[in-house]
Structure formats: C-alpha cells, structure tokens
Amino acid sequence: AAGEFKDEISPYEIVSHQPDLADGRRILTRNTVAEHDEGPRADTSVEGLAKLRPVFRNGQFGGTVTAGNSSQMSDGAGAVLLASAQALKDYGLTPLARFVSFSVAGVRPEVMGIGPIAAIPKALKQAGLTQDQLDWIELNEAFAAQSLAVIHDCGLDAAKVNPLGGAIALGHPLGATGAVRTATLVHGMRRRQQKYGMVTMCIGTGMGAAGIFEAL
C-alpha cells in the first residue's frame, strides 16, 4: 500500500522536551515529523502472530482474541469538512464525495461489537442502494472476531472490506476513527474511479453506525 495514504495524511511537527538524565540541569528538545500511521509493523509475520496466546477463555473453549488480531492503542486525530451545496457555491469549494445516508442502531450490550449488523441495512435502505452496489467498505475492526461476525451476518463481500487494512493493522484512535476511515474510503474510491462506499463501526454499549458515501 505504498503511497496509498499520502493524500489523506497531513504531516505535522511534534516538539518534545525531556530532561537530560545524564545532566539534570539540561532539557533536551527533539523535533519529530509525524507523516505515517504508527500502527504498521514491517516485522510482523504469520508465524509470529500464531504464537500469541489468547487473552480470553471460556471454560473448556479456547480463546481466539490475541494481541495480534485486536486493534492496538493508538494516538491520532482526523478531520473532515461537511458542507451544504450552498456553502460549496459560496466559498468556491470542490467536493470530494457526497454524504448519502447515515444510520445508528443497537444490539444487546452483552454482544457489543456487532452493532453494524443493525445499522448497515438501515443506511442502505435510506440511500436506496443494495450491498452489491457498494465498491468499498471500511469496517472498523476493533477485533478480528467482531469484524468476521459482521461480515458473516450481513453477507458482506470480504474482498471489498478494508482493502488497505483496518484498525488491527493501522490503529484505532478512539474519536478519530470515523474521520480517518472516511478519508481512506473517499480517497481510495476516487483513485480507483469507484462510486459508492460505506463506513461502519461498532460503538460501546451495543451501538453501531453506518454511513454511505458517493465519490465525485
């Protein structure tokens, strides 16, 4: 995916100040330019992931959730600009995509994580679309098990889901994920000359959200 995220990341400089442990009277200043997601790890291998132990177990059943198939702790920020047709005209802006529909729905809190199963059909109905018309699906994967459940229950085309990787590979900065996933979707569809895409994610306590976008 070299260069795939270039258009959606705005590099910025971070200035950090730390005491010099060898000389307590000095403060060291370091300048770092953040221009890549912190999540991807080039040294990750299938063999290494297979060695990780499950975090949860239920009686005699072996667990499936490991540090390797769960989203990591991430720092991040994201922003999108949502404008009306009149605002686009007034300020001379060229839109990248059209926000077609949005829905929020919920499932029982004890099965939190599969909220998108309830939200996706509502968003598609509002947009007047079917799943077959979606070219790209950004499904936030807090855990691989959660994503697989949504793909299975909704009958999503796995080949269209997270084609550039999801939160497990890239990170899941809470509060920024919606904007980040939307940026990936919109820029990706425009590069590939695709038309319709969806961003969906689970939210704590059983909620789920889904949004449909049309690339312009």
Question: Where in the sequence are the language-model features?
Answer:
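N-terminal extracellular/periplasmic Venus flytrap/periplasmic-binding protein-like
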Residues: 1-85, 90, 153, 158-160
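Active-site-proximal alpha-helical scaffold in enzymes
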Residues: 1-4, 79-86, 151, 173-194, ...
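Active-site pocket-lining segment
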Residues: 12-15, 100-169
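Short acidic, glycine/serine/threonine-rich loops at helix termini
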Residues: 22-25, 93, 110-112, 173, ...
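Hydrophobic alpha-helical scaffolding
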Residues: 35, 39, 109-113, 172-175
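Condensing-enzyme catalytic core mediating Claisen C-C bond formation in acyl metabolism
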Residues: 44-114, 118, 122-125, 183-184, ...
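Cysteine-centered functional microenvironments
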Residues: 61-71, 102-103, 135-142, 161-177, ...
